[in-house]
A protein has these predicted regions:
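Short Lys/Arg-enriched helix C-cap and helix-to-coil transition segments
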Residues: 50-66
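Helix-turn-helix DNA-binding helix
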Residues: 39-40, 46
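Helix-turn-helix/homeodomain-like alpha-helical modules used for DNA recognition
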Residues: 63-136
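Residue-level signal for the short linker/turn that defines the boundary of a DNA-recognition helix
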Residues: 22-24
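Short, Lys/Arg-enriched anionic-surface-contact patches
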Residues: 1-10
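Low-complexity intrinsically disordered segments
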Residues: 130-152
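Short alpha-helical "recognition helix" segments of helix-turn-helix
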Residues: 26-35, 39
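Short alpha-helical "packing" element that flanks the helix-turn-helix/winged-helix DNA-binding module
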Residues: 11-19
């Protein structure tokens, strides 16, 4: 268990992901062949660990917390150091990721492919459709608006 996976056990991560995808606790319990109480307890623990992981990541990076949602796996904040909005996400595929709002020069960036793959994986895991052949900066705008409930 590490910060990058929210200090969750594999079972807690699975249960949290099922709930994040919209499955009811009773359905998760049936699928995993355990009691609803077991699922309820595991979800409470998972949400607390994710909340603590998101807040710890914000604290380490000196990000002022504005909104946090452990069930959906995100923290919205502001970086005084970079003077920009910041989004910290938690997902089963990417773990903890920090995203700073900025005007990217994606075409000239060495990490273009890596950023694009990470953003597409984040969107796929959250059932958010993105257009094809966009730059990572465009994906990020659309994805983060969808995650935080903003407009884009």
């Amino acid at each position: 268990m590490s910060l990058s996976v929210g200090y969750l056990t594999p079972k807690q991560l699975l249960i949290w992901d099922c709930r994040r995808r919209g499955l009811q606790q009773a359905s998760i319990a049936k699928e995993l062949q355990v009691s609803r109480q077991t699922i309820h307890k595991a979800l409470n623990i998972a949400n607390l660990k994710i909340l603590e992981s998101l807040e710890e990541t914000a604290r380490i990076n000196k990000i002022k917390v504005q909104k946090v949602n452990p069930l959906r796996g995100f923290l919205l904040g502001y970086s005084s150091h970079f003077k920009t909005k910041t989004l910290i996400t938690f997902s089963t595929k990417n773990g903890i990721q920090i995203w700073y709002k900025h005007e990217g020069d994606c075409k000239n960036c060495e990490q273009l492919k890596e950023c694009k793959e990470t953003l597409i994986a984040e969107a796929h895991e959250r059932d958010i459709s993105l257009p094809e052949d966009c730059l990572p900066s465009d994906y990020a705008e659309k994805l983060f608006a969808a995650i935080t409930g903003g407009k884009k």
